[in-house]
Structures are given as structure tokens and as C-alpha cells.
């Protein structure tokens, strides 16, 4: 049944609303029944979940007038659902105590209703006869479901209209819209003829970006970061890219790029850019516990827009080995990102680091200072390069108070295609680093390589079972191991490499000590299975090998570990992680190890 609005029906609706509000006619539990012969199980479920009458109790509809109001609204609701499913000739009957709801006068409605019966005669399923969208922009692809002979649905019509409009917008016609739409149901043939006429409008070019909103960022910096394409042909993708560049700075809580309603007489289209700044400062904390290495604490302090040019100043600090087997060590780092110094997808940065590392095999103090540039290719891919100096003073297996002075040129590229950074179920992550280092003050020169690749795949629906794998490769090419600072060399063991083995326990024997290798290979595999939405169990195996040469070979030293773990999901923070691991291979093992932290192991 399809109802048309009229002044009389509107007046009846007003009176009806007043009566619903004023008359406390409470009804006893309403007995309901839905009959839809020939309808699929999924369609019946949709009707049951959507009908106001069938869900009256859960909606809190108590009075007879509320039940009647729900029944009247259900006519339109059910017909629309039938149209969505391709039934364009349905007959809907809703009876309250045996009387058709549409025929009940609200002013003389009974005080209670005891029973509601909904009967839906679906009729035949319709198919498209005509399915036309005109005119179309070049290369526009309409939905496959909108074609002659295909099952007719209102959803297919709406999607076809949207695709046609979007095709013109992609071609630069920013104000393209639907001009007219003709839909004819031919009941005798169970056929639906749909014709959609589009109004492309003129092709427009980008005009000006007009900055609005409450922001303390200099407008000149906003424009440089945005790279607004004034003078270029309109493109929705370019608008989206402008917003992405601005959000990427981490300065703004809200970025809205909205086109003006009316184009300019010269064929350009201006845009309003509205901003709201995030709070200027942000503090984070982290902790990780390992049985042998004690507690590691980390903290960061970030100041956004520190010089009103959308810069981000970040301090980080760490304390390690608290209560562990080695002396407490830590680090203090600083990085200043400057997004408005180069082009819209490029930024510059300053970095500085002071670090002390105390391990079983070496102690080293490091200071570094660098300046670099970063190119962002997409939300998933970036590369950066910098130049700077590093000073290292080390005590290791090769001697005490050894000094290393370098001019370094680190390159790094990261490609992140994971579906989640904190608990991935599919995709991959690649991190490649190359760092040439030129020795100063009689220090040897060389190149350091490092690669970290991770992959994820789901076996069950909704990520119920996830297989995760990781490969790490490292190499130092050029100088011998005894002529390189120990923090450039490679060890294996502990969280991040081989769980079940003590931290950095595997290296190259040198006299009575152990030094790092010039090459490293790490392999890790995990099977993650959900027990509940929040709780997961994990089984894992890790393998590590180091070698004195620049490539891990048959003569390398190796070890491995395996174990089980529990993950408890903390939402956007990632899971709370607890792992138990034991040595499997090698002579560096020290019994059962446990690890507690936030986030997946990789």
C-alpha cells in the first residue's frame, strides 16, 4: 500500500500526535505475527527487525495510539524494503485485532490492541527492462546490477545515478547532478524501466582556497603544506589529497575542505578550508616487562605547532633494565618536523640523540645530530634521508674506551599495507634502511643495511585465526667487526628477535667475551587465534643467526625459541601482551622467559 500526503492526513497526524502524548491508554502484551509467503529467510528477518509493530515491546510502545502509529508507519517502511529487494508490486496488510490499521480512526481507536497481524504478498520479483543513465562522461563504469535483465532494486538505481554523477565530477564537472529520473513499473511483465538524466554542468578549474576557522597556524604555512591546485581542472581526488596533507601534520583536529555552492563567472570554483587545532601538547607513556631484563619505561612529550608553522617537536625518553640483570640505561631523543619548508608532500626535520646502552656484552654511549628531508608518496609509503654526525664511546669484547666518530647519511623507506598498525590481520609491512658512514679521526668507513618485513593473513572470518610472519636482515659492509662501534653490529635474543633467549645473548665469541656480528638473520612466525572478541591465544617460534662476515652463511651462530602467549584487546591501543617462551636451539638459553607489554610482538 502506498499512501499520498494530503492536508487532511497532515491534520490527522497532528491530532494523532497530540493524542499519543496525552492519552495514557496502556496496552497489555501485544501478540504479533508476520506472514510473507515466498519471501526469503533474510528478507523475513529484515522485516522483523525493521517493523515498528513487531518490535513494539523493545521500542517501549505501550499505548494503543502508539501501536496504531507504528502500524501506519510500517506501511511505508515495508513497501520501501520490498522495493529495495526488487518487489515493485507488493501488497501489505497490517491488521490490529482483525481490522486494517489504515482504516482505524485515531479519534475513536480502542483503548487496547491485543493482536497485530502483518501479511506481505511479495508478488513477482522485477527485472530491469530499460536501464539508462545519460549522458555519461568518458570512462564511466556503471554498476553491473544496473542493466537490462538484471534484478531491479532501488539500490541499483541509486548506485547508477551516483556513479554517473561521480563520473562527471571526476572529469572536472564539479556541479554535476541528476536532472531527472523516470522509473516505470510494468506490472504485467514484472519489469522496471529506469531512465536517469544527468546535468553535467561546465568543466571547472580550482579557484582559491579561503582559510577559515580558529587556527593559530600561519596561513602561509597552511597554503604551502596544502599545495592547493589553483588553476588546475577540478578533481575530487585532488581535494582529498589537500585534506590528507594537512591532517598528516598532526596539528589539526578538524580539517574540512568544502567547495562553494556557486562557481565564479570565470569558470573557477573556490573552496572554504576550515580548521580546528588539536591541543598543543601531548604526553604518552609505555612499559614493557621481561623476566631477565626487568622493566623498560618510555615516555614522549609532543608540542604541536611550536613556532606557528605546523611544526611538531617531539621529546622521547626511555629507562631500561630497571630491576634487570644489567645496569640501568636509557636514552633521550629529540625530533623537530617542519612540514612547510619544501613542497606539499615534502618536509624537513632535525634530530638529536643521547643514549647509554648497558648490556651483558658491551657498554656504549652514543650522541648524534642530524638534519634531513622526508618525501611522503602516500598514506602508506614514505622515504627519508638525512646527514649528520655520530659519536660513540664503547667498552666491548675488543677493548675498553674505544672511540668512534662518524659522518652518517641514513636513508630509510617504509611501506605499510597493514589493516591495523597495532594488531594486523592482513597486509604487509616493509622497512628498509641503508646508512653509509664515513669514519673521522682514524675511524673506518662502511655501509650498514637493515631490512624488516612482516606479513599477515587471516584464515577465519573476521580475523579469528591469523598467521603472522617476520623476516629481519642486517649487514655491515666494509670494515672488520673490531673496527665498528658495537651499536652498528648485530646481536640476537630477547623481545624483538628471539623470545625464549636472553636479550642480545647471541653474538661472535671473542676471547672471554662476545661481540656483535656483521650480519644477522631473524625469522619469526605466529599463529593467533581468537577465543572471544577481546581474548586471543598465540603460539610462536623465533629463529636468529649472526655471522662474522657481511652475509649470514653456513658457519653462522644460531639459536631459537618458542612459546605461547595471551592477548587482551585494549581497543585502539592494541592488545595487552603476555608471552611465555623457552629456548629450543642453541647454547645461550637461560630457562623460561616471560614478556609483558602493549601491542603485538610484531
Task: Give, region by region, the residue ranges found by the protein language model.
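Transmembrane beta-barrel strands of outer-membrane/channel proteins
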Residues: 261, 285-289, 299, 315-319, ...
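Residues that define the transmembrane beta-barrel architecture of outer-membrane proteins
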Residues: 74, 293-295, 328-332, 363-367, ...
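Outer-membrane beta-barrel architecture
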Residues: 272-274, 300-302, 335-337, 368-372, ...
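C-terminal outer-membrane beta-barrel translocator/porin domains of Gram-negative envelope proteins
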Residues: 248, 267, 281-282, 288-290, ...
Amino acid at each position: 500500500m502506498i499512501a499520498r500526503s494530503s492536508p487532511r492526513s497532515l491534520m490527522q497526524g497532528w491530532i494523532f500526535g497530540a493524542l499519543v502524548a496525552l492519552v495514557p491508554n496502556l496496552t497489555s502484551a501485544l501478540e504479533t505475527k508476520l506472514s510473507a509467503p515466498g519471501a526469503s529467510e533474510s528478507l523475513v528477518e529484515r522485516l522483523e527487525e525493521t517493523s515498528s509493530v513487531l518490535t513494539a515491546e523493545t521500542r517501549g510502545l505501550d499505548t494503543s495510539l502508539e501501536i496504531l502509529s507504528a502500524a501506519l508507519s510500517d506501511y511505508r517502511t515495508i513497501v520501501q524494503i520490498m522495493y529495495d529487494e526488487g518487489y515493485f508490486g507488493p501488497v501489505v496488510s497490517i491488521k490490529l485485532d482483525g481490522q486494517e490499521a489504515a482504516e482505524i480512526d485515531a479519534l475513536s481507536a480502542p483503548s487496547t490492541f491485543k493482536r497485530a497481524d502483518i501479511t506481505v504478498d511479495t508478488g513477482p520479483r522485477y527485472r530491469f527492462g530499460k536501464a539508462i543513465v545519460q549522458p555519461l562522461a568518458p570512462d564511466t563504469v556503471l554498476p553491473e546490477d544496473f542493466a537490462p535483465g538484471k534484478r531491479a532494486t532501488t539500490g541499483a538505481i541509486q548506485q547508477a545515478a551516483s556513479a554517473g554523477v561521480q563520473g562527471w565530477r571526476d572529469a572536472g564537472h564539479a556541479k554535476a547532478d541528476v536532472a531527472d529520473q523516470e522509473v516505470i513499473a510494468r506490472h504485467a511483465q514484472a519489469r522496471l524501466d529506469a531512465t536517469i538524466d544527468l546535468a553535467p554542468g561546465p568543466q571547472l578549474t580550482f579557484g582559491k582556497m579561503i582559510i577559515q576557522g580558529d587556527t593559530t597556524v600561519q596561513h602561509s604555512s597552511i597554503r604551502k603544506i596544502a599545495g592547493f591546485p589553483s588553476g588546475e581542472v577540478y578533481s575530487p581526488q585532488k581535494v582529498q589529497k589537500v585534506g590528507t596533507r594537512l591532517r598528516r601534520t598532526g596539528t589539526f583536529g578538524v580539517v574540512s575542505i568544502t567547495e562553494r555552492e556557486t562557481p565564479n563567472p570565470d569558470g573557477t570554483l573556490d573552496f572554504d578550508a576550515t580548521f580546528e587545532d588539536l591541543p598543543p601538547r601531548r604526553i604518552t607513556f609505555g612499559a614493557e616487562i621481561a623476566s631477565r631484563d626487568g622493566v623498560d619505561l618510555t615516555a614522549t612529550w609532543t608540542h604541536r605547532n611550536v613556532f606557528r608553522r605546523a611544526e611538531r617537536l617531539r621529546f622521547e625518553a626511555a629507562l631500561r633494565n630497571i630491576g634487570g640483570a644489567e645496569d640501568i640505561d636509557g636514552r633521550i631523543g629529540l625530533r623537530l618536523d617542519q612540514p612547510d619548508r619544501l613542497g606539499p608532500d615534502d618536509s624537513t626535520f632535525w634530530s638529536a640523540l643521547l643514549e647509554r646502552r648497558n648490556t651483558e656484552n658491551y657498554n656504549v654511549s652514543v650522541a648524534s645530530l642530524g638534519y634531513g628531508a622526508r618525501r611522503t608518496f602516500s598514506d602508506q609509503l614514505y622515504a627519508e634521508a638525512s646527514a649528520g654526525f655520530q659519536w660513540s664511546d664503547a667498552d666491548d669484547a675488543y677493548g675498553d674506551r674505544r672511540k668512534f666518530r662518524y659522518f652518517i647519511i641514513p636513508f630509510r623507506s617504509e611501506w605499510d599495507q597493514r589493516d591495523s598498525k597495532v594488531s594486523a590481520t592482513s597486509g604487509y609491512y616493509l622497512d628498509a634502511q641503508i646508512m653509509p658512514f664515513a669514519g673521522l679521526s682514524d675511524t673506518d668507513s662502511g655501509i650498514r643495511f637493515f631490512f624488516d618485513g612482516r606479513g599477515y593473513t587471516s584464515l577465519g572470518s573476521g580475523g579469528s585465526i591469523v598467521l603472522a610472519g617476520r623476516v629481519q636482515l642486517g649487514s655491515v659492509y666494509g670494515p672488520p667487526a673490531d673496527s665498528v662501534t658495537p651499536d652498528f653490529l648485530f646481536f640476537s635474543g630477547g623481545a624483538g628477535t628471539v623470545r625464549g633467549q636472553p636479550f642480545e645473548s647471541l653474538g661472535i665469541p671473542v676471547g672471554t667475551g662476545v661481540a656483535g656480528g656483521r650480519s644477522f638473520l631473524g625469522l619469526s612466525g605466529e599463529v593467533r587465534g581468537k577465543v572471544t572478541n577481546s581474548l586471543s591465544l598465540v603460539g610462536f617460534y623465533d629463529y636468529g643467526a649472526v655471522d662474522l662476515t657481511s652475509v649470514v652463511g653456513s658457519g653462522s651462530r644460531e639459536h631459537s625459541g618458542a612459546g605461547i602467549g595471551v592477548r587482551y584487546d585494549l581497543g585502539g591501543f592494541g592488545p595487552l601482551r603476555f608471552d611465555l617462551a623457552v629456548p629450543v636451539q642453541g647454547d645461550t638459553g637461560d630457562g623460561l622467559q616471560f614478556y609483558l607489554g602493549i601491542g603485538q610482538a610484531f
